[in-house]
């Protein structure tokens, strides 16, 4: 029954429900549900048990496949769209972000490798060099497969040798016709093409954005240049007004790049110095604006731009006169247009003269009629009753009752201007329209023109060409008269023609056409001329500079430099070489000979005094030895007179001894001086001296001649003394015969010595600084003048020196003098036991005899005999705080440790560097 009821139609069910609805007056009573217990019973527990059958249904066991799997094929239907037509495709460029791994990959510069074989041909950008050279090398190496991939144009195959491939015939270049435009005119085509694309782009954007083209963002900066020029003009005019803005940069000081002592001084710019360049005006003419599709449109009134501010308007009015003076080249750029250089040019200019007073006397009807015709011509182009023409846009009408005197005047003047190069042709048109109702007959009449150079013109060549035959212009017809100009010669040419009409228009006033042409010379040698002018200008500048410099040098007269005395640089070594040309000078050996000479001369003098014997001796030449053996003073030797110098220079044959090899012309002068010394110190002069004078003179010194030394030794009376002297003399001569080879200086020793000196200097400076900082008393120094041998020591002067003025050189000198004085004391004690040490000490003493010696206050114990000043004793007795002294010593110890640490590090670094260099270089050897 339920199934039967379910199959009944929906309308029947609705009717039954409506019929049963009134039979249910009360809703059924809801029974309360019985409480359900949460405790599971035994049946429920058994029902929850898991059976194996249920598990097998859920998890089907997978058996291993013993045979091959059955192939199951399925068919799918795929819907493919038809490709669109290629002509309707639109390509868009989409920018995608770069691959992040692209930057990490190293660039491959190994070349194309095998990419040639995969492609059909090799492109020029795939190789370095030209394709011709690449193919030639490939063919030479026998790689024909690679050579086939190179496709070269036939005109470039001529570079390949004839043995490899036959030479193809290169096509002949076709000559361009003379009337063809030059290739430089292609930029006009590109300009027009780009302008067309720009116009299309503007139209699309303006339609899409619903904005005019002038308000687009791409055209928003058209007026920015004008605003910048106006700002610059106002900024230049503001310094003239006293409104707190002036050219502060003009009065500002110069800037430094870095420090004022070691930096660079920055010069001012031209603008800061007042040298301002004129304002350059850049605009777009009206023709260019129309060509680019930018009509001149004014901004809306509600746009409050910079140039519309009230402050700017008042500022313009206040600076109007000054801006006009500063920027006086304001031109109407809207009317300018670039025609081109050397391009034929033509223009038409119409001039309508003012009405004369005589024409005003004509009837009022004619005047009213003429005005009405003019107004009609300006408003609506409608035909005019009677004869009338539009001559180049100007109305020329028939006037009744014309005055015969008006025929002398010009009614309408037309000027046609031509400009072209010589030999080229240009043209211009003249338009005449018959806007009346009457046919007008016309003819051309050439007007006479006054020529001021008739004698110079030999032939009259025609240069203007046009159709000058008469004709008729029908009503409503338009005539175009084309005028051509061509001239073989450069110059300015002019012709005047009159356009005659019948009936006569404008009361007989002439319709004049003036042809004005300019023919320019083509400058063929412009580049060569400019190059020549630049060379001449440079040559002129160099010539002028040289002439000015020569004039200045001639005007400057510098006095000649006083020649230094030729004998000012004679040293002991030079005298020794002159006396003994075959021997080599050694300072130690020569000093030993000096001591030996002094020793034997003193012994001989004592013997002579004891015996009172007068025996004839060999005359000797004695030369006073200067305090410093390294040089001889000019006062020791007599100066040569000018005439004697000239004689010695002119006659070099007067030299007594042969010259030594390698001696220059200066040695000639030295030898002549030595000859003078020989003459003045000769035996005759010694004999002329009186005995009293000889007694008062000090003992003679050795004249550095070994032969004289030997002769003097031979005069000794005792044979033992003579033999001993000869042995020592022969020993010294043997040493002097050997040439002394100087060794290379020890670089490491010198550098370490310099570092040690720097450490000592820095230590002394730190000590002085600590003393001044802690308030300790200043130390004293004593200056001592050490006299020469045989002289009495002058009194010692003790001077107090402040720590700030104590220099490094004084401290070094004090330390060195300490060593010399101690060595000298030891020498006096030892005597002649150690001759080698005496030689070294004597050499040191000879180098520093004339210098002042500085000794510390600790050396005053040796000078107790002298009277010290009172101030020194007072300062030495001042009490010193032990705490301050302890602090001073601690600080000084720390400084010493730091300085010594740095010294050791520097020495190690230098030793390592020099050691690495010595490993590469050769070992030290004697200089040959």
Swiss-Prot record:
Broad class of where this protein is predominantly found: cytoplasm
Q: Where is this region: Disordered?
A: 1-38, 164-183, 786-881
Gene Ontology terms: cellular component: clathrin vesicle coat; cytoplasm; endosome; extrinsic component of plasma membrane; plasma membrane
Chain positions found as Phosphothreonine: 558
Signal sequence residues: none
Please give the function described in this protein's UniProt entry. May play a role in spermatogenesis. May be involved in synaptic processes.
Under which name does UniProt file this protein? MYCBP-associated protein
Protein species of origin? Rattus norvegicus
Q: Which gene encodes it?
A: Mycbpap
